[in-house]
Amino acid sequence: MAPVGVEKKLLLGPNGPAVAAAGDLTSEEEEGQSLWSSILSEVSTRAGSKLPSGKNILVFGEDGSGKTTLMTKLQGAEHGKKGRGLEYLYLSVHDEDRDDHTRCNVWILDGDLYHKGLLKFAVSAESLPETLVIFVADMSRPWTVMESLQKWASVLREHIDKMKIPPEKMRELERKFVKDFQDYMEPEEGCQGSPQRRGPLTSGSDEENVALPLGDNVLTHNLGIPVLVVCTKCDAVSVLEKEHDYRDEHLDFIQSHLRRFCLQYGAALIYTSVKEEKNLDLLYKYIVHKTYGFHFTTPALVVEKDAVFIPAGWDNEKKIAILHENFTTVKPEDAYEDFIVKPPVRKLVHDKELAAEDEQVFLMKQQSLLAKQPATPTRASESPARGPSGSPRTQGRGGPASVPSSFPGTSVKKPDPNIKNNAASEGVLASFFNSLLSKKTGSPGSPGAGGVQSTAKKSGQKTVLSNVQEELDRMTRKPDSMVTNSSTENEA
C-alpha cells in the first residue's frame, strides 16, 4: 500500500501535474509518429508492389490450331478477327487486394514460317526476361502435335540466339528458371482460389528449402523463360474415339510424349477447350501466376483425359511411367509418328462447274451429228409387210392360197358393185354354224362330232390367222367363186 500512497503524493505534489502532462504529451507524440510511419510504409509498399507493366506473352502455333480464338477468349471478347503475320492484343490484369490494373501484351505469330522474322518486333533482349512463351497444339489433329512443338521450339531457340544476349545474363536467366522449377511446392488444401499477390515464403528450416537435383531428361533445353504448352480443341477426343478408333492407350501415349517434351523445356501442360469452356479460367490464373507472381492454389490434374493440367516443376519420369502401365500394343520408347499415324486423306469430289455452251456452236454440233446418221426409212417403207390395219401378214401364206378354189387356173376378176357380198357371206356363215350346232347336239359322243369340232377349231384358227382386211378384199374381188367355195364346205 505504501508505494501506492507515494505515487499519489507524487501526482498531487506541486510539480506532479506538470510531470503527468509532460508524460502524456510524450506518449501522444510517439503514437502520432508510429501512425505516420505506418502510413508512409504502407504507401511505399504499395508503390513498390504495383503491378509491373511491359510483360509479354508470345504465342506460337500452326494455322487453324485455335491460338487466336484462345487468347481472344482469355481477353474477354466474344469474337476475334484473324490477323496476318504478327497479331497483337492484350490481357487485362487486376489486383483485387490493392485495386491495381495493368495490361499484359500478347503477341501471336502466324503459322507460316515465312513470318518468323517479325519476332524482333515482339521480343528483344531487354524484354526477354519479362516474357512468357505459349506453344499451342491442336488436339483435333494429334498426329501433328509433336512435330509442331519441335518446330516452334526451334524457331524460338533460333530467335533467342540471334539476340546476342551476353552469356552472363543468359546464364543468370537459366539459373533463375531452374530455381523456380525446383522451388515448386504442392498447394496446401483449403487455400482460397482467388488470385492474390504472392508474399514472402516462410519456411521452418533450411533443410526444407534444399533443392532436389534435376533428372536426366529435365531442362535439357533451358530457354531461360517460362514455357507453357496449351493443347486446344480437347473436346475432339470423343471424335477421335469414334471416327479413328482411339483408345485410352492412344491418349496415354500422346500425354506421355507431351509431358516428356515439357520436362525438357521445364514447361507446364494444360488441356483446354474453347467450345466447352474447359480450363480457360485455370489457364488465365496460371498465366498471371507465372507472370505477376499471384498465388496459385490448383494442384495437378491427371484424372480426366481431356482436362489435364500439370504445372511446371511437378512432373518427373516416375510419374510419367504410371501411364506406361496401361500400354499393351506399344512401347514407351516407340516413335510418336509410328503409333499416332496420320489417317489417309479422303479426296473430296467436287462437282465441276458447267459452263453454258454457245447456242450456235451447239446447233452446229447437232447438225454434224444428224448428217452422220443414216437416213431413217418412212412409215410406208418401214413396214411393207403390214396391211392397212397395221396387223402383220403371215409369212409364207398368201391370201388366195389360204382358201381352196375350184378353179385354180382362173384369173382374178374385178368385183361387181351390184352384188351384195355382205349378205351372202353372212348367210353362208350362219348356215355353217347352224349345221355345226345341229351335229353336236344330235350325236355328242359319236366320233363324227369330234371330227366336226376339230374341223371347226381348225377353220377358226385359219380365220384368226388370216388378215381381216385381206379376206374382205378377196370376198369383194371374187364373189362368185366365194359362194361356190362356201357351199362346198357346207356339203363337206
Curated annotation (Swiss-Prot):
Disulfide feature: none
Domain of life: Eukaryota
Record family assignment: Belongs to the dynein light intermediate chain family.
Molecular function terms, GO-annotated: ATP binding; dynein heavy chain binding
Organism phylogeny: Eukaryota, Metazoa, Chordata, Craniata, Vertebrata
A Pfam family of this chain: DLIC
Residue numbers bearing the Phosphoserine modification: S194, S383, S391, S443, S446
Region (Disordered): 187-206, 371-423, 437-492
Protein name, per record: Cytoplasmic dynein 1 light intermediate chain 2
Keyword annotations: ATP-binding, Cytoplasm, Cytoskeleton, Dynein, Methylation, Microtubule, Motor protein, Nucleotide-binding, Phosphoprotein, Transport
GO cellular component, as recorded: centrosome; cytoplasm; cytoplasmic dynein complex; microtubule
Chain positions with Phosphothreonine modification: T441
Amino-acid positions noted as binding ATP in the UniProt annotation, renumbered to this chain: G61, E62, D63, G64, S65, G66, K67, T68
Omega-N-methylarginine modifications at: R397
